[in-house]
């Protein structure tokens, strides 16, 4: 069945791709740009910024069927279906997609994008360019669509079911029916992030609209998923999947609470251990699990149906859990009890409102509870099979123009199986811990806890923690502060509120690091002829901005990086500053672990709590505990502490990151206009608050090399929610600079222009040291570089032969004092695009500051 419809789909996709071999990156076009007879432009895009690599399409299919191959339109490489972790050739999805069914007159119609047989594909996009997938990213501030971007990787696709041409939609030979459109349009938006807390899930947001002129009655929406989990090298991987539903788990982040998950999970049945040793092949084995989390459905209700089944050519093996009905159990086409093949059967399953038990429990006879008795091979099914499942929502009535929202998260989690665990310890053998954490973060990113998105005063559900050492418990809050329930009434010296659920209004926004500072560079050559680059920045916005989730200032520190190439993977940490604060570990007797329960404590807060001379450093592990007698309950409490980051908090050392104005107190006001008017001594000549002015001097640099320098900002994370510190990316704000005298110094001192290397030797092997360092794939002839330095910011360089012929003219035009404004290069190629020969050459540098003349030698 899979082979048949995949072959037809391959033909259709290749036909569309051949007709329109174009880039995916295009903005939305308001007026039609295609001809009526053009075919739909079927294409794909790859989510790969996080740890999941997953293919989405503009014809409704999520993933890539294992019987076919598709290729990334950007890279040309084979497209992954759902690899996790990416790069390890382990797949967790065959395909997924929407089912939409409705009653239209006397007909029951269902449109599907996946899970239909024999080459049927009923959703299609418009022709190119309207049908193309739009790409947006918060990483691209220069894109015209930056302001509307949601994540680091947004894909937007629009498709409809309006095409009824059987040559495109395919023909169902079993049911002998052609596609009959509902006339619906789906806008599919998918979002992914690369941050540590969000790189294990992808959000998919669907808007399903009735674009016909008729009402659609009793509409049901379903999400079909076929996982087929295993190594890509294993052609039989789809025969041993397991799946089930997980309602809730005990919270690991707020003691005493239960985390509501409501996920449908799927995994390989055993993680494919080595048959001899029983060990797993690390990330190259299917030891992870995946889940589908429903975040929003098209109604205020939160209920939905869950059905799973085995699809097989053998009708007797095609089976799924079914409830007994008064008129008997409905059998699907061919007497099947599993896979619904006709529109009527698909609609019946979506409307059944059944919620199946877990596949791993299929062997258990539930006939007394109203279910069909298990089949003869129930034990085999329980241990793994080719499973599909469907989540269904409805019914709804849709008038023309109405739209239904549906938002889901595809979540992955590691260590579902791991070495040292075995079937004898089932709960440890199949660990949901990673899925639990990643599901929570998907939920929080969708609807941010503590954020009043619609301005109605509701920020979601929360708990209040009492943080002072005399109290060690959680106060329960129900609905509003007026309904606070306390076990004991007392005053907390230090309190904190933790929101754990949003206000019900989608945000689609993740936690972000502090705003990165804008740096300015001031290069120079010192008296020892050593290059230096002074890096300056103002941290006002960085240090006063609040975190999206905690609504608190969570700035932790700065880091200085440098790179020779500018490559994202080539940046090296050279210096850092972070606040002096500590994580406090307390013992959880129920889990028998030491854990961090609160945000980091500053040294000032710790001394307020434990005495003005308190030093946490001697209490650094469970063998070196700090004992404190809590007089309120009359018992001893024990903690240990670890530095949160390095605690490099000395800002007076001029060899490290330091304050430009070390004696400047904290500002009297954070309003710049007010400060300039009433506190001018607190403001720099550039109009910035002096207190937040920093600098770092990079020393002993080679003036002949370019350096990429950057300053990042990072926060302290949220240890209680498993969120590690977030840091801005070094390469996103890097400045390319030479450790030479700046153009300002060159102009003020009328410095002599210098050319290097002089002489330039073709056999000098400069490429090994600095030539072509930024373009290593280019030929040597095109990466040669003769350097000019001590240039004014705006001038004209002309190169002449010894006979006075003009060889090359170079226009040098930079803003005054801009990075690199003192420097330029020539690739030894003439104005006629010819490589020059050996000889003596003259040059002139003309600017408003005068004209300089010099010469250099080229030796072949």
Model-derived segments and spans:
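Positively charged n-region of N-terminal signal peptides that target proteins for export
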Residues: 1-5, 860
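Bacterial N-terminal signal peptides
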Residues: 6-16
């Amino acid at each position: 069945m899979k082979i048949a419809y995949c072959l037809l789909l391959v033909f259709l996709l290749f036909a569309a791709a051949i007709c329109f071999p174009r880039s995916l990156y295009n903005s939305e076009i308001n007026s039609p740009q295609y001809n009526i007879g053009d075919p739909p432009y079927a294409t794909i895009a790859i989510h790969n910024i996080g740890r999941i690599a997953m293919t989405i399409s503009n014809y409704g299919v999520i993933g890539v069927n294992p019987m076919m191959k598709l290729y990334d339109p950007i890279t040309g490489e084979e497209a992954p279906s759902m690899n996790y972790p990416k790069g390890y050739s382990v797949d967790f999805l065959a395909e997924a997609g929407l089912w939409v069914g409705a009653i239209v007159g006397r007909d029951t119609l269902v449109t599907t994008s996946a899970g239909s047989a024999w080459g049927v594909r009923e959703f299609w996009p418009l022709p190119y360019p309207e049908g193309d997938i739009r790409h947006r990213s918060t990483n691209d501030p220069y894109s015209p669509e930056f302001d509307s971007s949601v994540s680091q990787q947004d894909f937007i696709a629009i498709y409809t079911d309006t095409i009824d041409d059987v040559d495109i939609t395919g023909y169902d030979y079993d049911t002998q029916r052609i596609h009959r459109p509902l006339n619906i349009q789906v806008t599919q938006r998918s979002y992914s992030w690369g941050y540590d807390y969000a790189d294990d899930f992808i959000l998919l947001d669907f808007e399903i609209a009735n674009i016909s002129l008729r009402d659609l009655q009793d509409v049901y929406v379903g999400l079909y998923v076929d996982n087929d989990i295993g190594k890509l090298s294993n052609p039989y991987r789809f025969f041993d999947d397991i799946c089930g539903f997980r309602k809730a788990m005990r919270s690991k982040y707020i003691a005493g609470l239960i985390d509501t998950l409501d996920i449908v999970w799927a995994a390989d049945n055993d993680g494919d251990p080595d048959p001899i040793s029983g060990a797993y092949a690390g990330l190259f084995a299917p030891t992870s699990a995946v889940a589908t989390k429903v975040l929003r459905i098209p109604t205020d209700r939160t209920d939905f149906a869950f059905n799973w089944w085995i699809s097989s050519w053998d009708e007797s093996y095609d089976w799924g859990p079914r409830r007994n009905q008064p008129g008997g159990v409905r059998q699907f086409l061919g007497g099947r009890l599993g896979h619904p093949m006709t529109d009527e059967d698909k609609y019946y399953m979506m409307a059944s409102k059944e919620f199946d038990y877990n596949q791993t429990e299929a062997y258990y006879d539930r006939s007394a509870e109203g279910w069909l008795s298990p089949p003869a091979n129930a034990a085999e099914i329980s241990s793994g099979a080719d499973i599909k499942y469907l989540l269904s929502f409805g019914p709804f009535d849709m008038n023309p123009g109405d739209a239904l929202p549906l938002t889901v998260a595809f979540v992955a989690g590691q260590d579902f199986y791991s070495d040292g665990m075995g079937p004898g310890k089932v709960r440890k053998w199949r660990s949901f811990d990673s899925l639990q954490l990643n599901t929570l973060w998907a939920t929080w990113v969708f609807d941010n806890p503590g954020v009043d998105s619609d301005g109605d005063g509701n920020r979601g559900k929360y708990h209040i923690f009492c943080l002072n050492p005399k109290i060690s418990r959680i106060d329960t809050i129900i609905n509003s502060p007026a309904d606070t329930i306390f076990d004991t009434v007392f005053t907390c010296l230090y309190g904190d509120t933790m929101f754990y659920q949003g206000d019900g209004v989608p945000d689609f926004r993740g936690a972000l690091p502090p705003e990165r500072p804008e740096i300015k560079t001031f290069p120079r050559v010192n008296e020892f002829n050593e290059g230096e680059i002074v890096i300056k920045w103002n941290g006002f916005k960085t240090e006063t901005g609040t975190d999206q989730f905690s609504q608190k200032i969570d700035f932790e520190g700065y880091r200085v990086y440098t790179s020779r190439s500018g490559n994202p993977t080539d940046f090296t940490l050279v210096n850092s500053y972070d606040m002096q604060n500590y994580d406090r570990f307390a013992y959880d007797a129920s889990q028998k672990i030491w854990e961090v329960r609160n945000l980091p404590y500053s040294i000032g807060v710790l001394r307020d709590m434990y005495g003005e001379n308190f030093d946490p450093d001697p209490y650094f592990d469970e063998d070196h505990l700090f004992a404190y007698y809590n007089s309120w309950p009359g018992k001893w409490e024990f903690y240990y502490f670890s530095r949160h980051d390095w605690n490099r908090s000395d800002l007076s050392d001029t060899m490290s990151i330091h304050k430009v104005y070390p004696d400047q107190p904290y500002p009297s006001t954070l309003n710049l206009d007010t400060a300039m008017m009433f506190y001018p001594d607190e403001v720099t000549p550039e109009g910035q608050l002096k207190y937040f002015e920093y600098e770092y001097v990079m020393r002993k640099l080679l003036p002949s090399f370019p350096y990429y320098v950057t300053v990042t900002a990072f926060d302290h994370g949220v240890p209680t929610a498993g969120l590690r510190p977030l840091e801005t990316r070094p390469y996103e704000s890097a400045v390319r600079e030479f450790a030479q005298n700046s153009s300002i110094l060159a102009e003020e001192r009328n410095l002599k222009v210098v050319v290097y290397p002089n002489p330039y030797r073709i056999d000098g092997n400069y490429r090994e040291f600095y030539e072509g360092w930024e373009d290593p794939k280019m030929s040597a002839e095109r990466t040669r570089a003769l350097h000019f330095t001590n240039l004014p910011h705006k001038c004209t360089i002309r190169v002449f032969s010894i006979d006075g012929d003009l060889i090359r003219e170079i226009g040098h035009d930079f803003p005054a004092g801009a990075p690199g404004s003192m420097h330029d290069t020539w690739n030894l190629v003439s104005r006629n695009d010819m490589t020059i020969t050996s000889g003596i050459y003259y040059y002139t540098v003309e600017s408003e500051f005068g004209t300089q003349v010099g010469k250099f030698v080229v030796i072949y």
